[in-house]
Amino acid sequence: MALRLWASSAANALKISCSGATRAAPAYSISRYFSTVLDGLKYSSSHEWVKNDGSVATIGITDHAQGHLGEVVFVELPEAGAKVSQGGAFGNVESVKATSDINSPISGEVVEVNDKLSETPGLINSSPYEDGWMIKVKPSSPSELDALLDPAKYTKHCEEEDAH
């Protein structure tokens, strides 16, 4: 009985329904490991996401990446005005498991840094796509965005990577 109640609560929280009712598809997809992949973003194979707002692109690490890292305890980011290059490291994330470089999915100039992360690096774990964003960049080569993965391709990439 307790298991059934838990399953029902989990299904409600995840908005999963087994009934024949149809509803609009959510704005995200969930891989088999329950990492959230948002529609409307582009992704790199090294697990960074980009939200392009025209003249400025917001960058962070994906839910999949933070899940593999574990609890984030420290973040090192560049200062505003720094230049970043596609595929080049712009900072690092230290977790209870490891320290990992953060690679820029696009080239450009850093116009804003999420200063909240220096005091509360755990925002990367609790809200990787909202409060846990890392830097905002003015892209120097907007066409680089076209080479990034869409949500479906990124989800497939994660599933293939986790299978090995």
From Swiss-Prot:
InterPro entries xref list: 2-oxoA_DH_lipoyl-BS, Biotin_lipoyl, GCV_H, GCV_H/Fam206, GCV_H_sub, Single_hybrid_motif
Keyword tags: Cytoplasm, Lipoyl, Mitochondrion, Transit peptide
Keyword Membrane: no
Gene3D superfamilies linked to this entry: 2.40.50.100
Subcellular location(s) of the protein: Mitochondrion; Cytoplasm
Modified-residue entries (N6-lipoyllysine), positions: 97
All residue ranges annotated as the Lipoyl-binding domain in the record: 56-138
Any single biological process term in GO: glycine decarboxylation via glycine cleavage system
Chief place where the protein resides: mitochondrion
Cofactors named for this entry: (R)-lipoate
Record-level GO cellular component terms: glycine cleavage complex; mitochondrion
Transit peptide feature, positions: 1-34
Keyword match Iron: no
Entry's cofactor comment: Binds 1 lipoyl cofactor covalently.
Function: The glycine cleavage system catalyzes the degradation of glycine. The H protein shuttles the methylamine group of glycine from the P protein to the T protein.
Homology family: Belongs to the GcvH family.
Subunit record text: The glycine cleavage system is composed of four proteins: P, T, L and H.
Record-given protein name: Glycine cleavage system H protein, mitochondrial
Organism: Oryza sativa subsp. japonica (Rice)
Record lineage: Eukaryota, Viridiplantae, Streptophyta, Embryophyta, Tracheophyta
